[in-house]
């Protein structure tokens, strides 16, 4: 009989992971349940795929990758409407569990949704380098005693620039401008990171998108014909292990 938590997943992948190499990537995805009644783990979530609110299950994944291999090492289900933890709490819990399991990644990669001060400080306590994106309205200062301004207002060269993120400390920020004029701000606590390194890490961060796509298309994670929460959790675990 397999345990109903994520221990079974870890037992399966721990021998395949280089614990002091590679990167950890955290992101979430919505498992579509368009015909299910909102109950148990099925609630309303924003879907990046559909660009609207849909019925489904919100799955958070902690993925280990070295650029050539993708291995899920932990996951959580966001069920806050039923009294569960927030996404940010799940973020910190999975990182704490990863440390207890002996993981020491070269970097932790995640989206701006998880770039709260509490999460960034949790990573600082772990002494793990990170790379994330920040929203354009996050406040920074360039010199001591200077008034804080939105990061979007700061002049940032291609090689990046050190700024003081309000409430956290010094970080290095890179700005990318898309052909349509949209901008993205990438931030790391590694002051020595180059733009080439940032770009390479950003590509590794996209591995979790490939993982989520494979989980849905090849492992049937969205296809469980069950209603109870324990049965759904069991199906999620088996689908992830099948990957």
Regions from the language model: what does each represent?
Residues 1-2, 105:
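Alpha/propeptide regions of enzymes that mature by internal proteolysis
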